[in-house]
Amino acid sequence: MQKLMAMGALCAALATAAQAETLALDGIGNSRDVRCKGQDVAITGNANRFRLSGDCGRVEVHGSDQVVTVDNVANLEVTGGENQIEAERVGSLDVSGADHRITAQVQGDGEQPASVVLYGGSNILTLDLHGPVHLEVNGIGQQVTWRGDDPTVETSGGEHRIQRRQPCAGWRFDWNVIRCA
């Protein structure tokens, strides 16, 4: 009986470990729809198009010319250059590299402020801020526009443009989501 219980515990532990593994999406010019199911996701390569649906843990986007849309992600990290990311909801956002275009709704977990950290140069972030958010902008020539709650802002480097977006003039339909134009 003890051997049977030990075997059951081992199987449960292996199933949990398999579920906790990071899902790796890589290549050049690939296109794919993926359900996160709470998993962490690592995206690498060049010119891929990935749609991540559901709740994701940590999502890392490395490389260049990636186009990624994601529903809900706890932590989003973007490195490399010229990636385009659209996230319906992120808990924290960490960006480094250059010439990224990122659109996201940033919302903390209610216990701590959400965090947005930006390094590199010439990145463009368009953010909807909900609840307390700490925004740290470093590097050169970063552009951050937001609407919603005012963030606490910390800067270093230069030639940044950090400003509140004006109210909606109209609406647009993009990636099956209605957005302010």
Where are each of the predicted segments found?
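Extended beta-solenoid/beta-helix repeat architectures
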Residues: 18-181
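Sec-dependent signal peptide recognition
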Residues: 2-9
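Hydrophobic h-region of N-terminal signal peptides that target proteins for export
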Residues: 10-20
